[in-house]
Amino acid sequence: MKKLFLIIGAPGSGKTTDASMIAANDDKFAHYSTGDLLRAEVASGSELGKLIDSFISKGNLVPLEVVVNTIISAIRSSDKNYILIDGYPRSEEQMRELDRVLASQSEVKLDGVIEVDVSEEVARNRVLGRARGADDNNEVFNNRMKVYLDPIKEIRAFYNDKKILHMINGERTIETIVADMKNLIENLIKG
């Protein structure tokens, strides 16, 4: 059975960097972001990829069920047994659909949800300081923060009730955060 770990956090929390560093330094882990998975499925030319492309090419959102099926498909086809996915779920609907799909199969088990916790001020400084793209301005940051914050209480409560939510302080050095997250994941794997 494959073990899935979801890494969540505010924009600028470092969740993508943390997860990619763990996977880069330990080859038993695979790391995916939802956007990468959708693009890879399109590139594969599969039926699912063609369906995804029919939405993306028109600038439409990919339906929830398709996104979750893409995630599960990628996990199943991965040659790794430990999967890190960052930035998912972003809504209550995404969370509930993933939970529904995971409950209906026995190949993948969600072993942990790790939230990289940073203050809004730290997140803002990181995002506006890095200025990676056109979307890294104050107005867009505020919107992204709202999108993150609106469902987070429900997401935390849901995974807390399942006893799989873990918080990591994201306001330390990257080395410390990654080491902490890796230790936490290793302990969860051991059970």
Curated annotation (Swiss-Prot):
Keywords: ATP-binding, Cytoplasm, Kinase, Nucleotide biosynthesis, Nucleotide-binding, Transferase. NCBIfam families: PRK00279.2-2. InterPro entries: Adenylat/UMP-CMP_kin, Adenylat_kinase_CS, P-loop_NTPase. ATP binds at residues 12-17, 130, 172. The lineage of its organism: Bacteria, Pseudomonadati, Campylobacterota, Epsilonproteobacteria, Campylobacterales. It is an enzyme of class 2 (transferase). The gene is adk. Pathway: Purine metabolism; AMP biosynthesis via salvage pathway; AMP from ADP: step 1/1. PANTHER family: NUCLEOTIDE KINASE. One of its GO terms (cellular component) is cytoplasm. It comes from the Bacteria. Consists of three domains, a large central CORE domain and two small peripheral domains, NMPbind and LID, which undergo movements during catalysis. The LID domain closes over the site of phosphoryl transfer upon ATP binding. Assembling and dissambling the active center during each catalytic cycle provides an effective means to prevent ATP hydrolysis. It catalyses: AMP + ATP = 2 ADP. Its EC number is 2.7.4.3. It is found in: Cytoplasm. Residues 129-135 are annotated as: LID. This is Adenylate kinase. Coiled coil: none annotated. Catalyzes the reversible transfer of the terminal phosphate group between ATP and AMP. Plays an important role in cellular energy homeostasis and in adenine nucleotide metabolism. Belongs to the adenylate kinase family. It holds the Pfam family ADK. GO terms for molecular function: adenylate kinase activity; ATP binding. GO terms for biological process: AMP salvage. Monomer. AMP binds at residues 34, 39, 60-62, 87-90, 94, 132, 144. It comes from Campylobacter fetus subsp. fetus (strain 82-40). Residues 33-62 are annotated as: NMP.
